[in-house]
């Protein structure tokens, strides 16, 4: 029996809990769903008897992304949904080609956290039917049902020896750029059409300070 949904994730911290919520909701509605890491060993069953009807991807910017997410994992698929995790962008990134989808990625469903993102993608040639405004899945963790799921401020301060009476400023980053050399940052900047030099420098400085 074919699988209804295959959900692929890249970064565990960024995506996995939200993917679990999505999987459970799909199963509650009677669908079959499976979660796999993008680079997991490939399974022939996903190209054949368990080939999913819908592939849910973590990113889908261009034909190369379609190749790595879709063809390499399940072969041809006509129903592709991108959870589109990278939506908090700078003005420069919003204006560039990379984050506005290219090639056949424009034919995939690109979920949007808000109307502004949907309007931007439509202005760059995407159909309205492929840019649904869904909100961000991870925001569901703020619902009352998840009270107590995360540690509160007092608990975290106690664990790390901080004063809970003080205001805390959190710098949230994967620090993915901290380990990249200048040539790698330059190549990424060229590919994305925006300059990541300053951001990479900040990542390195903060990363070294907390090692």
Where on the chain are the PLM-derived regions?
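Active-site and donor-binding regions of nucleotide-sugar-utilizing enzymes
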Residues: 3-150, 171-178
